[in-house]
């Protein structure tokens, strides 16, 4: 499908609610030594800090045929020619991703702000650039953007980092003036901010004191809040803390997003459907909107190559696994 080039004002669409939208996560974390960001092969590199045959963090190689700007890597294609990758820092990379969203019917993205990177000058500069480019391309193609704070790696006391950052973003992008920033996602009449990583039992360095401060702080500023929680948040088992404060904090928020990645595969998903339906009942009874996660499958063999045990991902099966989840969740949310 050919896409005509139209003036930005004609492309702009106002996003007033998350309801009915299909949103993707957008990490924007890939770097190259020559992209100007001084982060080396960030997220491409293996555990030893190098990106080369035998040391990498990725299992899938990107098809870069449509990218305007690419970078030669230490890898070779089967024909002996150099293999190229993209950088998330480049405006042309982000623009292509939003063009694809328009082409394939994806409504927008949650652009992640990793709290741990906000304290690292090069990391902050990189993700500031990614967000700038995303806001520009979202407006160009009529797509939605929502900021998501990923708390992974955060320490106690870093809640101030989150609240200070969103204050700066609100001024920079006019988040509370929807006519001036129509591409920013609103929900329940307010700009939406996502906070991912509340209630997990994997030994994090922050707790409910910090997450409550973030949620209450965002609410006091006038935001709606989406909270990302473990898959088993309702029963508080398996991947979830057994602490009543989790449910209390979920009830403070506008939207609940459980993390289902890796919690089932194509064979076990049919049995997981009841879990989602029970989640939805709880959310409705407590006046919280519910957003289930669908994922296409993945492999992380190289990411976990340092571990002795064989690491198995979730087979994609040519899209059948993804379609199974989408069909169920779209049908149940009509």
Question: Model-predicted segments: where are they?
Answer:
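Bacterial Sec-dependent N-terminal signal peptides
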Residues: 1-10
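Glycan-processing catalytic domains of CAZymes
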Residues: 10-334
């Amino acid at each position: 499908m050919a896409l005509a080039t139209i003036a930005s004002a004609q492309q702009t669409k106002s996003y007033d609610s998350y309801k009915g939208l299909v949103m993707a996560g957008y990490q924007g974390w890939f770097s190259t030594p020559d992209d100007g960001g001084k982060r080396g092969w960030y997220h491409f590199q293996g555990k030893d800090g190098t990106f080369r045959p035998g040391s990498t963090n990725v299992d899938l190689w990107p098809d870069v045929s449509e990218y305007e700007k690419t970078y030669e890597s230490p890898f070779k294609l089967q024909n002996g020619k150099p293999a190229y990758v993209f950088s998330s820092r480049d405006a042309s990379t982000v623009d292509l991703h939003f063009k694809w969203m328009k082409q394939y019917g994806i409504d927008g993205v949650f652009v992640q702000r990793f709290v741990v990177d906000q304290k690292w000058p090069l990391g902050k500069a990189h993700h500031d650039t990614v967000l700038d480019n995303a806001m520009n391309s979202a407006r160009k193609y009529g797509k939605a953007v929502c900021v998501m704070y990923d708390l992974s790696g955060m320490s106690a006391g870093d809640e101030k980092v989150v609240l200070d950052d969103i204050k700066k973003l609100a001024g920079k992008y006019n988040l509370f003036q929807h006519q001036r920033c129509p591409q920013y996602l609103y929900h329940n009449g307010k700009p939406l901010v996502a906070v991912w990583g509340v209630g997990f039992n994997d030994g994090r360095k922050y707790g409910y004191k910090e997450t409550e401060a973030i949620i209450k702080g965002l609410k006091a500023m006038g935001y709606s809040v989406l909270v990302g929680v473990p898959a088993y948040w309702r029963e508080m088992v398996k991947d979830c803390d057994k602490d009543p404060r989790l449910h209390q904090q979920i009830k403070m928020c506008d939207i609940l997003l459980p993390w289902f990645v890796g919690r089932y595969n194509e064979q076990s998903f049919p049995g997981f459907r009841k879990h989602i339906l029970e989640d939805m009942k709880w959310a409705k009874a407590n006046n919280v909107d519910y957003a289930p996660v669908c994922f296409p499958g993945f492999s992380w063999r190289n990411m976990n190559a340092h571990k002795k045990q064989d690491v198995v991902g979730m087979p994609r099966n040519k899209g059948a696994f993804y379609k199974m989840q989408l069909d169920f969740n779209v049908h149940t949310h009509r």
